Amino acid sequence: MKENIKENKKTNTKAQNDLSLLFKYRKFLMGFAALWILMTHEWQIVTNETSFFFVTENFIKRIGFCGVDIFLLLSGMGLYYSLEKNPVSRFYYNRLKRVIFPFIIMASIVSQIDHWTNEFYFNIITGISFYKTNIYLFLWFVPAVITLYLFTPVFYHFFKKAENKYLFFAGFIELWLLFSLMARNVMREDLYGFTNRIPIFVTGFLIGYLCKEKVIKITCTDPQKLDLKI
């Protein structure tokens, strides 16, 4: 009887875990984030400047950078799941297939249209220009996430070994904060902006762990009181 109860509890973990909804609708949320980013870059304001809707439309357009943060958070979640079920070699192969190959193809097409030099093309596809010149030369987000992908298995290794995952996470964020303070006046401004998004990605990784390994219940009986149980 006790074994049946334990088995039922195990099989119902995902249903009980309120945070698992984030992973369930992760692709939908990523699509929303991508559209928000696109809106920031391409959307033309269509409402009258004197109307309330203009203020709202302009505000939503201006904070479209939040789409990048949403995307990184959800990417961190997905990578935890990926490393849980795949060896590191398979993990890297999947990133190569899904991200790097399409990036190289797109860069090759644009290089012909815009008449890039061979040196410029090489620097773009290898990420050299991302670190040495400017991150915004071409599809900056791809070299950014590739950088995160490269170091994620290392982070995962130490994260899994840590007895207290929350303390490990807090320690990592504190180390990042010290690095950020020291690099603020030394690092290029655009590159520094990218490093300031690392905590968002790592937070997504922690949420991935909570989604997969823990039972999270979020209850709100009072509009002014939110109860979180782990």
Give the ranges of each region predicted by the language model:
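Interfacial loop-to-helix transition and helix-capping segments at the boundaries
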Residues: T56-V68, I128-A144, M182-T203, I230
